[in-house]
UniProtKB/Swiss-Prot annotation:
Encoding gene (name): bbsC
Family label: Belongs to the short-chain dehydrogenases/reductases (SDR) family.
Protein name: (2S)-[(R)-hydroxy(phenyl)methyl]succinyl-CoA dehydrogenase subunit BbsC
Single GO biological process annotation from the record: toluene catabolic process
Pathway per the UniProt entry: Xenobiotic degradation; toluene degradation
Subunit-level organization: Heterotetramer composed of 2 inactive BbsC subunits and 2 active BbsD subunits.
Function of the protein: Involved in an anaerobic toluene degradation pathway. Catalytically inactive subunit, which is probably required for the structural and/or regulatory integrity of the catalytic subunit BbsD. This subunit cannot bind NAD(+) or substrate.
Length: 249
């Protein structure tokens, strides 16, 4: 069933993992024209071909950029094809470790990919949305932004993105641009061992792991015209797990 997003243009950053692919499928099903960005060119091309075969309008942009200039170049490629960007979805996953075990390079990578890159994408895309009087920004994060043990570098980046999302939502609210965060819980993966899957599910109130489609459905709602009265918010898609934490705003 198609939503009221028909004709819009969406840039999905890091569309080359399971969640990114699910978001692309969800938005394509709503009639959104897509630009898929990510480092894995082969996986992007395969996804683009799959979507095009279903009638979607789609382009792939192979990039692992975290620097401002390279990100502006990637955004320019999308605008050259479509003329505008109405929806920006920033999806990013990162490994974490205990603070003393983190190398200098890993700290830099966590902050670059988890905070600097989305910041630069926002700077490159949001001004055009504000000028047009419409925009939807959805940043995908996870529960590690709350500051869980052994997640120091990722928690620093994720909590920074949380603050950035709220600040930008207030700055852009009068211009028809909404900015929100989807916070994932434990999402099932084909590589997750069965024993680990069962253990993780036991700690979730609904007693199952999330799926990429669960995350994509939340993104689809926040990317739609009908979510225009929702901005600066954090939508937890975690099977109730966030309710265990004292701070889950």
């Amino acid at each position: 069933m198609k939503s009221n997003s028909n004709g819009k243009v969406a840039l999905i950053v890091n569309a080359d993992d399971a969640v990114g692919e699910a978001v692309a499928l969800r938005l394509a099903g709503s009639g959104v024209q897509l630009a898929l960005a990510g480092a894995d060119a082969g996986r992007l091309d395969k996804l683009a071909s799959q979507l095009a075969g279903k009638g979607a309008t789609v382009m792939a942009v192979a990039t692992a950029a975290v620097e401002a200039g390279a990100i502006r170049d990637s955004v320019a490629q999308v605008k050259a094809r479509y003329g505008r960007i109405d929806v920006l979805v920033h999806n990013e996953s990162a490994l974490a470790a205990n603070l003393p075990e983190i190398s200098d390079a890993d700290v830099g990578a966590a902050l670059d990919t988890g905070l600097a890159a989305p910041f630069h994408y926002l700077r490159a895309v949001v001004p055009g949305m504000r000028e047009a009087g419409f925009g939807r920004v959805v940043n995908i994060s996870d529960l590690r932004y709350l500051g869980l043990a052994n997640t120091s570098s990722v928690a620093a980046a994720r909590s920074g993105l949380f603050g950035l999302t709220r600040a930008l939502a207030l700055e852009s609210a009068r211009d028809g641009v909404t900015v929100n965060t989807v916070v994932m819980g434990d999402v099932d993966s084909e590589t997750t061992p069965a024993a680990e899957r069962e253990k993780l599910a036991g700690g979730i109130p609904v007693k199952r792991l999330g799926t990429p489609a669960d995350i994509a459905n939340a993104v689809g709602f926040l990317a739609a015209d009908s979510s225009k009265y929702v901005t600066g918010q954090t939508l937890f898609v975690c099977g109730g797990k966030s309710a265990y934490f004292s701070m889950s705003i």
